[in-house]
């Protein structure tokens, strides 16, 4: 059976939207409502143009076939404390960190451990600096990941949630193999997001 990451991501994202919008004052705008591709920088632009307060990118992780032991969850966030003047929050970095910690905690409660093979210092939070020497306007090193770089420059707290490894049989079976399991991930995300912004 061929399982495509984009389909799992879409199920988690649409269910997350449903859970979040049960809370008064929360409106969720998806960057895709069907099977089409929007560039990473245009996703942030779309969010900014729609006056978003946060950008959450929903993913399922994967490794090559010779690295099937990789398992667990992590959240990617900015490595920089750069704070553009147009930011809606007092600290983009602190907002991302608060949300990332909350999501990791809720996913851990589901039984999904912190990713075992990434440089997350056992926190489940990954921050990666660009490899080409690019910087933010304040001179701090820019982020490696386009979504995080564009989000930070736009003053929009942005994170990437990697829920589990599609390439790991145990992660797939325990967390990704049914709609009910995907919905549980979305519910954990929703609880964490609400907790971190209230």
Regions found by a protein language model. Give the residues of each.
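Active-site-proximal helix/loop segments of hydrolytic enzymes
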Residues: 3-198
